[in-house]
Amino acid sequence: AIFEEGAFAEGTGTASRIDIIPTYKQDILSRFKLARPVKVVLDGGNGAGGEICADILTKLGATVIPMFCEPDGDFPNHHPDPVVEANMQALMARVKEEKADLGIGLDGDADRLGIVDPDGRLLFGDEVLSLYARELLTRKPGSTVIADVKCSSRLFNDIKAHGGTPMMWTTGHSIIKAKMQEVGAPLAGEMSGHMFFADNWYGFDDAIYGSARFVALFSAQDKPMTEL
């Protein structure tokens, strides 16, 4: 074998280091504007995305109250699963304490999110997807919106009621993304908090982008979260 014989290729090459974070932030910021001020409590779950997300939301114009946004792989505050109520207790309490418009929780690698309303209630994943879908369908009526099999019939009925075409599909982020490409769906989501955006984004699940998008769509409403 090459390793055992030490028969490695020889030569010289180059390596470069590029910081993509400023470009990533600017890409998201260029896509949204807040219609009015929004107060957000952000629970980063001590994962990879908290600090970046807090900075983006602040630059977008939101008032951001950060919690557990420093990366720490020991996850000292709670397990970073933002769709489990037991993990979101501190966020739920802080939203009420601060009288915030909403709370956002991120998972460890920032591809899933949870949303908390001003009463401190953690929304189900299909409720979050329905709010993204309603906004999308005002711009792109008739669009296909994909949801995994764990989502309730309430979501599928809501998509229909707002002029969309709901599609139920198998759970799994790679499976959902493939189906989105196959049928040209601009939006998809799972009960687990994975939200996939091919409309005004690149077709994958990104909770930092999803946070900015949610805050922007909420800012365009004249109702509190509890009435949406």
Model-derived regions: residue spans:
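Short, charged, surface-exposed secondary-structure boundary motifs
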Residues: D74-H79, R134-L136, I176-Q181
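Conserved active-site and cofactor/substrate-binding residues in soluble primary-metabolism enzymes
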Residues: D19-T23, A48-I52, A86, A90, ...
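Predominant activation on well-ordered alpha-helical scaffold segments within soluble catalytic domains
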Residues: Q26-L29, A54, T58, F68, ...
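Short hydrophobic/aromatic-enriched beta-strand-loop microsegments
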Residues: G61-F68, L122-E127, G163-T171
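Phosphate-binding and adjacent anionic-ligand microenvironments
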Residues: L102, K140-L228
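Gly/Ser/Thr-enriched, mixed-charge loops and adjacent short helices
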Residues: A1-E98
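Active-site flanking residues adjacent to catalytic metal/cofactor-binding acidic residues
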Residues: L42-G45, L106-G108, A147, G189
